[in-house]
Each structure stands twice: as structure tokens, then as C-alpha cells.
Swiss-Prot record:
Record-annotated active site: 100, 196
InterPro entries linked: MnmA-like, MnmA-like_C, MnmA-like_central, MnmA-like_central_sf, Rossmann-like_a/b/a_fold
UniProt gene name: mnmA
Annotated stretches, region: Interaction with tRNA: 146-148, 308-309
Organism of origin: Burkholderia ambifaria (strain MC40-6)
Function: Catalyzes the 2-thiolation of uridine at the wobble position (U34) of tRNA, leading to the formation of s(2)U34.
Record's catalysed reaction(s): S-sulfanyl-L-cysteinyl-[protein] + uridine(34) in tRNA + AH2 + ATP = 2-thiouridine(34) in tRNA + L-cysteinyl-[protein] + A + AMP + diphosphate + H(+)
Protein name per Swiss-Prot or TrEMBL: tRNA-specific 2-thiouridylase MnmA
Enzyme type, top EC level: transferase
EC number(s) recorded for this UniProt protein: 2.8.1.13
Site, Interaction with tRNA: residue positions: 125, 346
One Pfam family it belongs to: tRNA_Me_trans_C
Amino acid sequence: MTKRRVVVGMSGGVDSSVTAWLLKEQGYDVVGLFMKNWEDDDDGEYCSTRQDWIDVVSVADLIGIDVEAVNFAAEYKDRVFAEFLREYSAGRTPNPDVLCNAEIKFKAFLDHAMSLDAEMIATGHYARVRERDGRFELLKAFDHTKDQSYFLHRLNQAQLSKTMFPLGEIPKTKVREIAAQIGLPNAKKKDSTGICFIGERPFRDFLNRYLPTKPGPMKTPDGKVIGEHIGLAFYTFGQRKGIGLGGSKDGSGEPWFVAAKDIASNTLYVVQGHDHPWLLSRQLVAGNVSWVAGEPPADGFSCGAKTRYRQADAACSFGRPALGRADGERFSLTFDDAQWAVTPGQSAVLYDGEICLGGGIIEFAATGQPGQTAPAAAAGHAGALAEAR
């Protein structure tokens, strides 16, 4: 009997290595595929691509599977990195890992795998896929502390129908145990952290290679200038470190946080205190939406939402602003409790219990007490939010 072929995305890490081993043990015809998504010729100090490939080959030899490398660097720069720079240039804080999953790991990679006569692809992500009544649902992982459905929320029915997440039912501690028991050479390798193409280098240094500095005033909510920023692109909402005000004696003496950006005047607004009103939001508008089921929830639907990775689901209600658009490009969320540092450019991802429904890119979040709203890069969407209320 012909074995079903599964192409596994292998990164050189423990998770994808155990994924490949598990599928081989289950009787699949497993082929490993190593994706090179970044040209790192000048980045040897920070990028680990060469060592990662060595680890992949070592693991493949141990478990007895074929492996190949494919270069998606051109696709990555065109579909992911270019958008990353555009968003930062506009004063927002994007999440390239979300776009990478949708455009590279589950599009370019999936297409390549199908050219190898694969029936399915698999990755080491911590999430689950469930088929019910001919439709595919994206579920949180059994190990909620490692759940990665937030990064996968833009996957569609066609992609999920061809995808396996073997680690979705396994706690991370068990994955490490398996790696050690079968003698994987990378069993003790540290998990990768941060944005894949930046590695361990200082983020500001990396960004400055592509975006110029553009100094401007740093102001308090009452308009007082208390410093100078190096460029709005280099700061994000809720940021505390690296704003140059650690020793300031002004105000209450509490820590300073980035609270807003005014693109028109190139002004960075900072506030004192973690719970300052300008850092708290109960409503947001998100655009560039994507729904796992292909359609949005009903207006007024009660759900949970994350506005950043690892955040606990926050209770909220879903709305569809009347923006004169028939394609459902935007939605609003009204939270039961105020959310901290909701950041334009990040993803707002919706959940119905364990089920990930999809989400969109945050464009605007209403902040402040009545009559006090912080300037924002997406201030043009304030009217849309008013319609959503």
C-alpha cells in the first residue's frame, strides 16, 4: 500500500524535528523541507541559517527521511518584508510572523509541497485543525502556554484542509522529553524568539538600516515638550525602555510610556504611569480582515479577543462599522474591560472558546477618559469607531 506523503517544514528546531519523527512513526512517507526566507550573507553574526540547515540534515539522517532546502527569500522580501517596512514607515507596529505564515509557510511552502506530490504539509506549530461537517476549524493547542493560533489566524479553508499540526495535542515538556529519548542532536536547542529575519540583534539597529531617523518633539498630554525622539518608526505603544526619559524628574516620578504618535506633526506623546488613561482602550477598529470560515461572525457576537500574543482572551462584542464598504473590510470590538496599549499594526484575533475565528489588523483604538483622546497615527478612523459604538 502506498504511504501518504507529508512534507514537513523543518527549521532545525526541536518542535519541527519531533513533528517529522512523529509522522514517520505513524507510517507516513515524510519529506523534510527547509525554508530559507532571508539572505543572510552579511548577517553572520546574528543569523543562524547555516547551523539550522546542519541541524535539519542531522535530524533527517537520524530518523531516516529525505530533506531538501528551498529558497523563498525573494517571495519573503516581496510579500512580507516590504509590508513590514511600509507599516513601520507609517508609524504602526506590524507583526511579520502573521504575514509570513499566510504568505510563505502556508502558501509558497504549500505550493512547493504539492509539486512534490504531497497530500499534506505539517509544521511544528502549537495549534490544532478539526474537520466538522466538511469545514475546517483552527483550534488552540492543548498546551495553552505555547498556543500559536494567534499567528495562524489568517489561514483559510484551502490551507487548513492540507495542514497537520502533530504537536497540537502535546505539551511542550513532552516534546522535549521525546527529543531526548530518541536522541535528537538538537534536543537541547533553545527555542527561537523574536522576528525571524532580525535574530538576536538590537531591533532599533536593524530597523535603522532600512528606515532613516527623523527626529521630532516628545510631548506630554498637555503639550509640554520634554525631549526629542529619533523617529516615530522606532517606538511602539506601551514602550517603556529606550525612550530616554528614565532619569526624568518631571511629573509624578512614575515610569514613562509611549502612548501615541501624531504623524502629521512628527510628535511622540508619552505619559507617566502604567495605567494612564491614554494607554487604556475599550474599543478598536481593525481592517485587512481574514476569517477562517470565510465569513465574519454575526454583528453583536460575544467572543474573546487577543490584541497581542500570549494575552489572555479578553471578553468583547463584535461589530461591523457602516463604512460604506460592502466587502466587510473592517470590524470593531468593544471590550468589557479596558485593554492596555492596544497597538495599531498588531493583529486583533477573535476566539469562540477554543476556536480561532480569524481577525484583522488594528487601525485605531479609542483611548483616554471622556473628552480626552490621544492623537494616533490612525486618527482618520475615529469617525469609523464612532459609527461602531
